[in-house]
Design a protein with these regions (language model features):
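A polyanion-binding, active-site-adjacent surface
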Residues: 2-110
């Protein structure tokens, strides 16, 4: 039997203009309670490169770069059953309420 896993709360504030959506956190992200925590995931390296920042593993610095650049992150799936981290293994998913999030944060201009 597969365990049911849940997404993190959105990282967003009133100044957020861009919303980046993932599927649902993988095993490593769930363990660390951090978005995109697996070292092989390129998300953070791309963000640092995009904004000409020196790469760091420090999660608070990573989150501050998103905030400084008005970027929000969340997942399209609120909860699901999944063995491992592969999206192809997702079963019985329930969607996050993205429409409600966008209504609450009208400054979002791009997803």
């Amino acid at each position: 039997m597969q365990n049911r896993i849940s997404s993190f709360p959105p990282f967003i504030d009133e100044q957020s203009e861009i919303l980046i959506l993932g599927s649902i956190p993988g095993v490593k992200s769930l363990e660390k309670q951090q978005y995109y925590a697996h070292p092989q995931n390129k998300f953070w390296k791309i963000i640092f490169e995009l904004f000409n920042e020196k790469f760091t593993e420090d999660y608070s610095v990573r989150i501050n770069i998103l905030k400084k650049n008005h970027i929000a992150i969340w997942d399209v799936i609120d909860s699901c059953e999944r063995k491992g981290s592969l999206d192809s293994e997702i079963k019985n998913e329930e969607a996050n309420q993205i429409g409600e999030l966008l209504e609450s944060y009208p400054n979002i201009q791009a997803i």
